[in-house]
Amino acid sequence: MKILMRADTHVSFSVPADGLKANFTFSQVLAALSVSLCSLVVGFVSAYTSPALVSMTDRTITSFEVTKDAGSWVGGIMPLAALAGGITGGPLIEYLGRRSTILATAVPFIVSSLLIACAVNVIMILCGRFLTGFCVGIASLSLPVYLGETLQPEVRGTLGLLPTALGNIGILVCYVAGSFMNWSMLAFLGAALPVPFLILMIIIPETPRWFVNRGQEERARKALKWLRGKEADVEPELKELMQSQADADRQATQNTCLELFKRNNLKPLSISLGLMFFQQFSGINAVIFYTVQIFKDAGSTIDSNLSTIIVGVVNFFATFMGIILIDRLGRKILLYVSDIAMIVTLSILGGFFYCKAHGPDVSHLGWLPLTCFVIYILGFSLGFGPIPWLMMGEILPAKIRGPAASVVTAFNWFCTFVVTKTFQDLTVAMGAHGAFWLFGAICIVGLFFVIIFVPETRGKSLEEIERKMMGRVPMSSVVNIKPFPFNM
C-alpha cells in the first residue's frame, strides 16, 4: 500500500517501494560504527551541563562560586565554539581528508574533559567547554560527509543514523552517570569515552571520493575494495566517481566562495540551511541543556534526574526506530511525523506552563510535562534530529561539499547558541508558555518548508542526487510539472 504525499514522496509500509536490498558488509558497518563513536562523545559533552550544573552551583560541592550568569555561559559557550569549529572544519576535511579530520578531534576531546575535571575556577571550565565545543563543531561537520561518501545508497539511511543513535547513547550515559556523580567525576568519565573512538578510527580508510578529488585513483580503488569487500567489483562505482569529479571540475571556477553562490549550488545549500534552522528552532537544545531545571520549574511530581533519564531512554529508542524506518518510509515521511509530534507537544507544554502561571491549578498534572517531553523527544529523534545531518551529506554537491558543509554546520551551531543562550531570557520575557508556543509556531513553518522544498533522497546514489539537484537529468512526467521551485 502506498500513500502519495508529493510527487517525490512515495511510501511503502511493507518493503521499500523500489525493491532495494540492503548490503551490510562488515567493513561498512565497522566504518560507520568507528566514526559514530565520535558522536557518542558529542552526545555526552552536549548533555553535560544538564546534570553537571546542579552540583557545580552547589557551594558544598564546588570550592569556587559558579554564578547563574557563569552557569549560562558553561552551557552557552559550547555551541558558540562549535560554530568556530564548523567554520574551521570545512577547509580541514578538504586538505587533511574526512577521516584524518575526525581522528584529529580525539585527543582534544580528552584534554578538554580533563581540563574541566581538574578545574579550580570558572575560567578553566569555560576553556574546557570551548575546546570541547570546537571539536564538536568539527565532528558534526565531518561525520555526515564521511558516511555519505563511504556508504552504499541501500544502507546509507540506516547506517547513516548510527551517529545519532550513539549520540543519544552518549546523552543517556551522561544523564545516568550525572544522577550519582558530581560535575568533576562526570568530566573524568567524559575524558575516557574518546579512547575507543581513537583506536578504531586508525583502522578505517579515507573516503574514496576524497582520493578521487586528489587524483589518487589507486588509493580510491583500495578504499572501495576495503569498504565493499574483497570480492566486490568496484570498477563501475570508481568509474562513476571519476566521471562525477570530471563533470564537477569542468563546471568549477577558481573561487570556492563564488561556487557556493552559483544558482545550482545555492539550491541544495539553502535546503540544508533551512533544515538546520528548523531543527534548532524547534527548541531541542534548550530542552537537552536545561532538562533538569525545566522539570523543577514545572513542579513535576517525578524526580528530575529520573525524568532526564527517561527522556534519554526515549531518545535512544526513537533513533533506533528511525534506523529501521528511514530506508522503508523515506526521509520526508519521517520529517512530517517528527514535525507534527513537536507541534502538538509544544502547544500542550505551552498550555501547561500558562495554566501554572495564571491558573487554573495544574499541580495534579505533574506527569504532563514528562509525557509531553517523551513524545516531543520521540518525534524529534525520528526525523528532525538525524535527518538534517544525514541530508547535508547527501544533497551538497561534491565539488563544494567541504566549504558548504562548513557553512551549514556553522549556521547550525549559531542557531544552537542563540537558542541555548537566550532560552532563560526568553522564558523571563515571554514566560515558559510563550517560549514553547514560539517554538511550536516555528515548527508549523518548518512543516510547510519540508512539504514544499525538501527532496526525497532514499535509495539514490550521491551522483544521482547531485545530477537531479543540478537539473542534469529529466525527471518523471509528474515531477516535471514542477509545482514547487525546489522540486526534485
UniProtKB/Swiss-Prot annotation:
One of its GO terms (biological process) is transmembrane transport. Disruption phenotype: RNAi-mediated knockdown is semi-lethal. Glial-specific RNAi-mediated knockdown results in locomotor defects. Neuronal-specific RNAi-mediated knockdown is viable with no defects. Gene3D superfamilies: MFS general substrate transporter like domains. GO terms for molecular function: sugar transmembrane transporter activity; transmembrane transporter activity. It is a multi-pass membrane protein. Residues 50-72, 127-129, 182-184, 290-305, 354-372, 424-433 are extracellular. Keywords: Cell membrane, Glycoprotein, Membrane, Transmembrane, Transmembrane helix. The chain crosses the membrane at residues 29-49, 73-93, 106-126, 130-150, 161-181, 185-205, 269-289, 306-326, 333-353, 373-393, 403-423, 434-454. Belongs to the major facilitator superfamily. Sugar transporter (TC 2.A.1.1) family. Trehalose transporter subfamily. Fails to transport trehalose. This is Trehalose transporter 1-like protein. It comes from Drosophila melanogaster (Fruit fly).
